[in-house]
Amino acid sequence: MPDPKLTVSLLKPEEAEQYMRIRHEVFRPTVNKILYARGEPSQETLDKVTEDIRDGITNKGILYVKCVDTSTGEMIAGARWRYVKPKEDGAKERTWEEVDAGLTVPPPYEESDPEMFAELFNLFNSNKREILGRRPYYVLDTLVTLPQHGRRGAGSMLVRWGCEKADEAGVEAFLEASPMGAPMYARHGFQPVKTVELDLRRWSGEDKMEFILMLRPAKQQT
């Protein structure tokens, strides 16, 4: 059972830096090796990440969600959800133009290896296109919990938040899981569809990163 002292709510724009710092700390041994392959990010880069988060909340409808320990007021975990849907009201599916417009590669950071950076996003984008096609869906882009607050149920609460949104809309939910995270997602109804990998040794890295692509079926509307 989740810790009763934990609450989940939408992130406010002024909390973007707190979320960024949690993401940076949690991603340090994994995804940061791709995002910042050439070294620890500068404060300027971290400020840019913070501004991108703030802009996503304010202008792009991205659903950043936080988990707070009410006994201390500390933000201990966060998630980034998006609802990918047709622009036209009443449309059941997106156009292929809408699909491709949403599958972009953001600009790399100063500390990125541009080719490795693009390869990750192209890997994820091509598989979203293949697996989801033109269908609407919720996607969990990011889930991060501070390691010292693990096993309190924060991650599960943030996943459940998005699953409930997907159920309300009657659409599927999708994510790219690490092998370690996949069992928790499975408990929320996500099913493995495909396993993909990015071999960082192609760019003088040390690791091969594996991702399990998982899909949660749409809840039938009654």
Model segments located where?
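Helix-loop element at the rim of GNAT/NAT acetyltransferase active sites that forms part
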Residues: 21-40, 56
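Active-site rim helix/loop that mediates acceptor-substrate recognition in acyltransferases
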Residues: 38-64, 68-70, 80, 121, ...
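Conserved acetyl-CoA-binding loop-helix of GNAT-fold acetyltransferases
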Residues: 145, 151-164, 187
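Conserved active-site alpha-helix within GNAT-family acetyltransferase domains
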Residues: 156, 168-170, 179-199
